[in-house]
Design a protein with these regions (language model features):
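Lumenal/extracellular ectodomains and adaptor appendage modules
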Residues: 1-105, 370-385
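Second-shell loop/turn segments in exported
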Residues: 14, 59-63, 222-230, 262-269
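Short, solvent-exposed loop/turn segments at the edges of secondary structure
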Residues: 57, 68, 98, 143-145, ...
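Secretory-pathway-linked proteins and extracytosolic
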Residues: 68, 80-85, 89, 93-241, ...
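Short, well-structured beta-strand/strand-turn elements
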Residues: 83, 112, 248-254, 286-299
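Short, conserved helix/loop micro-motifs enriched in His/Cys and acidic residues
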Residues: 249-270
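Hydrophobic/aromatic-rich core segments of domains that either
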Residues: 274-357, 362
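Long hydrophobic segments that form regular secondary structure
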Residues: 345-348, 356-385
Length: 385
């Protein structure tokens, strides 16, 4: 349980500070009962660290001190973001009980958001008129807006269950999606996205689309495989996969975006995305078409068809086309390179193959392998009449 004191807050920071987010006002404390008195221990700034995890992605990491069984932990922070078009969902529940949680958002009048609340637990909500300064370029505009306050008190733990696809789908939470911007004297600009637009966004992303265009970083070493002597595509795929897995070990983390392949190969370890992008480049170099099939992991919630959202995507597997009419799947989180053998967390009912020239498509990964589970129950019943 003490692992809850190790907190990671992801945020964005584009190169050259073109657009960025700042985490400010961070404050964290631990409360312990000692000799009948509540003792508060505040976190010091020297345990707060920043970590770059991609060209545009950062993590703020900190550890709350003096945490043990029975400790109450508390932390708060504020996000200042240039990415007004993307506000992260706020989850009021966790897999441990929440004594109190609060979320505040102030929205200028020109921004039109779709606000969705769902979950079984009740949140106290307050909507108030607000007056604020809005920075637009070098201009400071005084405008009105709406301040939204959401509070949760004594929320129960939301435990995972083997019979539930994803407990997070039932979590009490608030989702905000920007629908459009309506400035005076300007045309209304819609921000509602389609899946085709999300395809394009990913293909242009430096930590995703650029990885699909990279040259095979193991091109010279791969000649030792003598792929030209192998008969079928399946044999080549398995040989390439085994060769790569001997170079890079999976670090047990799933991701959507990747680090530099040079860095991954140097460290000898990486996320499934780090390794999968290298695998795609190697397969393409061998003349075997391969694409990322993006998804939301089963433990992260169902990917919605009707509400396209890039925030719902969190990883991908490799979709391989050994022939024009077939697709097989691989993921670097699997130790042995068996085709169509995926861990249960990746066997989702919907994934989207990202391909150039508007050739993206939806696929289901629920039944990619011929898996059958049988349970036999024997019981002896005694009847007393």
């Amino acid at each position: 349980g003490t692992s809850y004191a190790d907190v990671i807050i992801p945020y964005y920071e584009l190169p050259n500070n073109a657009m960025k987010e700042n985490i400010i006002g961070l404050d964290a404390s631990a409360y312990n009962l000692e000799n009948g008195k509540i003792v508060r221990t505040k976190m010091k700034k020297d345990v707060v660290f920043k970590e770059r995890v991609g060209e545009s992605r950062m993590n703020l990491k900190f550890s709350i001190p003096q945490v043990k069984a029975g400790t109450l932990i508390e932390y708060e922070y504020r996000v200042e973001s240039d990415f007004f078009f993307s506000i992260d969902s706020w989850k009021a529940q966790s897999d441990i009980p929440i004594l109190y949680t609060e979320y505040n958002v102030t929205i200028p009048e020109y921004f039109k958001f779709n606000i969705e609340m769902h979950g079984a637990e009740k949140l106290e909500t307050v909507n108030e008129n607000a007056s604020l300064n809005l920075s637009i370029g070098s201009q400071l505009l005084r405008c009105s807006g709406t301040h939204l306050n959401f509070q949760g008190n004594q929320l129960p733990a939301l435990k995972d269950d083997s019979h539930v696809w994803c407990a997070d789908d039932y979590c009490t939470q608030v989702n905000l999606e920007l629908q459009g911007i309506d400035f005076p004297g300007s045309l209304y600009k819609s921000f509602t996205q389609s899946w085709e637009q999300i395809d394009e966004t990913l293909l242009k992303d430096s930590d995703f689309g650029s990885r699909l265009k990279m040259n095979n970083p193991l091109k010279e070493e791969m000649t030792a495989l003598h792929l030209e002597q192998m008969k079928g595509a399946d044999e080549k795929i398995c040989a390439i996969y085994t060769f790569l897995k001997n170079k890079v070990r999976w670090n047990e983390k799933y991701a959507l975006y990747s680090k530099s392949p040079k860095q991954v190969l140097k460290e000898g370890t990486g996320s499934n995305a780090d390794i999968n992008f290298i695998l795609i480049s190697m397969l393409k170099d061998a003349g075997i078409p391969a694409y990322p099939a993006v998804m939301s992991r089963r433990d992260m919630g169902i990917l919605p068809y009707s509400h396209p959202s890039i925030q719902k995507l969190n990883t991908f597997v490799v979709a391989i086309s050994p022939t024009d009419s077939t697709l097989v799947y691989l993921d670097s989180s699997v130790e042995n390179g068996y085709l169509n053998v995926l861990p249960p967390v990746l066997m989702t009912n919907r994934a989207r193959i990202i391909a150039p020239d508007n050739n993206s498509q939806w696929v289901s990964l629920e039944n990619v392998g011929a898996n059958l589970l049988r349970e036999l129950l024997q019981a002896h019943v005694k009847l007393f009449i």
